[in-house]
């Protein structure tokens, strides 16, 4: 894949990518400020608000970063130097790792919070925020340290076209690395992502079992008219399942597109599709949070009424 092929990528792909980034930035901004306001209001705030606010902030920064990278991919106006390339590529990789880590730990915290009193997870309910904060800091340090090789492998794109370089944008490229060096950096990253995806799978499986058991108990304890009402626990559980199912599907699809890109010599189209797929969760997940969280709707309603009264 060379830089000329990226410039001449189909216009519909470009429009889709920039639309996704714009919508995602707006949605994550709304979600972040909503939870930020709720954190300052003691009667509305919950411990999980801080983690959702951090996830939305991370996704917001991720989409801004990929927006800058995409602009350099399709609009060859000016050229970045090596320092700018290294900083943006490293920041993007770091924010992607933070997003995966925050999604996993938020899912685990949600699972512990919604678990019934008879569950073995009850003992972690009061300790979980502190433990999860510590785990998050641990994974952040890992991502910061293991991503430092990007400063060595990222350079400003040379003027001469070469098949040895892997073009990222019009200004930035990856230096070719040996198989042993590639394995040395990719193996820890694969293990780390497998661990986080495994935690997401386990906690999601637990929530499926909880939802199924809760539904069966409702059939025995209530009449049909009463059991049709959805409890807050069921609503929250379904929100988790929608988000995590969507996350896992996109993660698998992203890897399929990535290997397809590696298979074909001219993978400019696959490269753009991979970017769109890999950032779809950051764009769509805020809408799921906003639509299923009644507190946000009430907050916006109260703020609108205050503005109208003024």
UniProtKB/Swiss-Prot annotation:
GO terms for biological process: response to pheromone; sensory perception of chemical stimulus. Pfam families: V1R. One of its GO terms (molecular function) is pheromone receptor activity. InterPro entries: GPCR_Rhodpsn_7TM, Vmron_rcpt_1. Expressed in 1-4% of neurons of the vomeronasal organ. Only one pheromone receptor gene may be expressed in a particular neuron. Not expressed in the main olfactory epithelium. Glycans are attached at residue 159. Signal peptide: none annotated. Putative pheromone receptor implicated in the regulation of social as well as reproductive behavior. PANTHER family: VOMERONASAL TYPE-1 RECEPTOR. Belongs to the G-protein coupled receptor 1 family. This is Vomeronasal type-1 receptor 97. It comes from Rattus norvegicus. The lineage of its organism: Eukaryota, Metazoa, Chordata, Craniata, Vertebrata. The gene is Vom1r97.
